[in-house]
């Protein structure tokens, strides 16, 4: 075959949504029937995309959470993903209608036994006027008006993002009575090379 360069998308061709509760492995990129299937990070979540040989991009799955790997069949994509602040499960994406169905329930017992803090999304502007985003987890048993200690979590990288994905460490802190703040400052992924470049 002929090797050709596809148009640059100004985005990492991978899911860089951070979590401390996922294992590696599995497909991150594959080709089938004239399409290149891959993950990319958009702001604070993973997208599952495909691109044809002319460089036309199609976003197949675009919702909060993290996708760690996938497998493509004729009319479906099977993926391991974190949805709704749950640990990773197996999901099926129907390529005909775009519907997503959860297939496994490996972690239902864990979620039934543990009270999780749900992230609240917020935005703010830095000194340069650039809009940044972040999340806050409230302490377990939160009571308005009561004072609580807080922890600011920072991600490494460069080119990683925090999003609505389960973090064991953060949930442990919230369960111990802490507010947990985490943001995506300059240098984070998901917003193009200019935003990620901090040098």
Predicted regions and their residues:
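Residue position within the beta-strands of beta-propeller blades
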Residues: 36-39, 78-80
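Serine-hydrolase catalytic core recognition
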Residues: 68-199
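Short, structured coil/loop segments at alpha-helix boundaries
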Residues: 5, 49-50, 167, 192
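Structural motif
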Residues: 1, 44-49, 85-92
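Multi-bladed beta-propeller domains
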Residues: 1-30, 41, 50-68, 95-119
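Conserved residues at beta->alpha junctions
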Residues: 46, 61, 81
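Short coil/turn segments that connect the beta-strands within blades of beta-propeller domains
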Residues: 33-34, 75
């Amino acid at each position: 075959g002929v090797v050709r360069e596809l148009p640059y998308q100004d985005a990492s061709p991978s899911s860089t949504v951070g979590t401390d509760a996922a294992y590696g492995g599995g497909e991150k990129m594959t080709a089938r029937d004239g399409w290149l299937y891959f993950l990319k990070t958009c702001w604070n979540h993973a997208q599952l995309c495909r691109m044809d040989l002319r460089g036309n991009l199609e976003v197949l799955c675009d919702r909060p959470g993290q996708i760690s790997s996938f497998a493509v069949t004729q009319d479906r994509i099977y993926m391991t993903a974190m949805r709704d602040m749950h640990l990773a499960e197996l999901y099926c994406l129907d390529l005909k209608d775009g519907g997503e169905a959860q297939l496994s329930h490996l972690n239902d017992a864990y979620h039934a036994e543990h009270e999780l803090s749900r992230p609240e999304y917020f935005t703010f502007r830095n000194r340069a006027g650039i809009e940044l985003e972040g999340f806050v987890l409230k302490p377990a048993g939160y009571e308005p008006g009561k004072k609580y200690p807080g922890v600011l979590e920072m991600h490494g990288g460069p080119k990683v993002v925090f999003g609505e994905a389960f973090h064991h460490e953060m949930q442990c802190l919230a369960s111990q009575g802490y507010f947990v703040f985490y943001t995506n400052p300059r240098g984070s992924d998901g917003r193009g090379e200019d935003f990620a470049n901090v040098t």
